[in-house]
Swiss-Prot record:
It comes from Xanthomonas oryzae pv. oryzae (strain KACC10331 / KXO85). The keyword tRNA-binding applies. Its main location: cytoplasm. This is D-aminoacyl-tRNA deacylase. GO terms for biological process: D-amino acid catabolic process. Its EC number is 3.1.1.96. Coiled coil: none annotated. One of its GO terms (cellular component) is cytoplasm. It is found in: Cytoplasm.
Length: 146
């Protein structure tokens, strides 16, 4: 399981011309699920999403987490994140979890984050074609693994 996180001033996800999830200041996390990801990895990634320090403190250092700032979290499933891009000119998707497995893991991640984060957790729609709109703050972008 992996997450591409971006610190944002705002972000939203639109499906069929309707906004299905949106946040103000916080984190947008694109989530890729890989075959064999287990519950422990999902719990660990949730913990990292909420506690990873990417927000500035009073001294300007990245020393505050999403939990510290009470910012929004927008979780978006993205199977292409788990693609194999090691050779050729076209991605391979055998390194991404099958849809049923990925949806279960993604939903578990959402549930854990909603349980632990009072700042609000929004999502896109699993398996849908989504338009993601964001304003990256920094830019600040990190690739996280459990």
């Amino acid at each position: 399981m992996l997450a591409l996180i971006q610190r944002v001033t705002r972000a939203s996800v639109t499906v069929d011309d309707r906004i299905v999830g949106q946040i103000g200041p916080g984190l947008l996390a694109l989530i890729g699920v890989e075959p064999g990801d287990r519950d422990a990895q999902t719990r660990r990634l949730a913990e990292r999403l909420l506690s990873y320090r990417v927000f500035s403190d009073d001294a300007g250092k990245m020393n505050r987490s999403l939990t510290d700032t009470n910012g929004g979290l927008l979780l978006v499933s993205q199977f292409t994140l788990a693609a194999d891009t090691s050779s050729g000119n076209r991605p391979g998707f055998s390194t991404a979890a099958p849809p049923e497995e990925a949806e279960r893991a993604f939903n578990q991640l959402v549930d854990i984050c909603r349980e632990k984060h009072r700042g609000g957790v929004e999502t896109g729609r699993f398996g849908a074609h989504m338009v993601v709109d964001l304003v990256n703050d920094g830019p600040v972008t990190f690739l996280l693994r459990p």
